[in-house]
Amino acid sequence: MANPVAKRSFRLRLHVLGSKLHKWLAIFVGLQVLLWMGTGALMSFLDLEEVRSEHVISRAAQTLPDDAAIPRWLSDSDDITAITTRVLDGKTVTEVRRADGAVSLHEPLSGRILSPIPAATARSIARRAWVGPQTSIHAARLVDESVGTEFRGPFPAWQITYNDVANTRVYVDASSGAVLSARSDTWRFFDFIWGLHIMDWTQRDRINSWWLLLFGIGGTIIAISGFVLLANRFPRTKRRARHGQVAR
């Protein structure tokens, strides 16, 4: 038969150990756990369509005319992986993708190269893409390197800034004329709290950092030690209730 004194002693030691673990880890990990819960709630609250600026930026392809010219000047090229004839900024163009990843735009009949597109064309593409409240374009600049966490390529690309309340920017591929991404203050706020959530405060694209792993394990231990403390309290509560009934 188990020794009741030894059993109580073991429970007491377990309770003390669980209490210490719970207390010190809660102090160390508690703030980040609070940030996880708070940032998770905020991200759930934000409308993903608004974060992506889909309510003001359209990426729908323009319809290709029935009489569009079919390019014949590319038949002798071996390194081409894709040829697409489409409408860009109201004009028919042929997009050529090559094995090395290069993209170029051409005049369909002559093959005259049209890329990289100039600032005026990038502005016009951005104006056509805008479907929000009436606004104008504030600035256009060519970027060939990452713009913080806001845009990481491909490069070169045109950064077009609108005169709207959300400080919206679109990035237009200088090689293909495609609208690559749209960023606004809502997206920047979402990106900031995402960085807090995954504990990557600079690049905000690593979800397996040592910081996140360490605090994740710490949070798990807090939960387990909390259950240990709770389990050790239940028998005491029952014994107190039983002794109270006997006393009566």
Q: Model features per residue range: what roles?
A:
Residues 2-248:
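Conserved histidines in hydrophobic membrane contexts and catalytic metal-binding motifs
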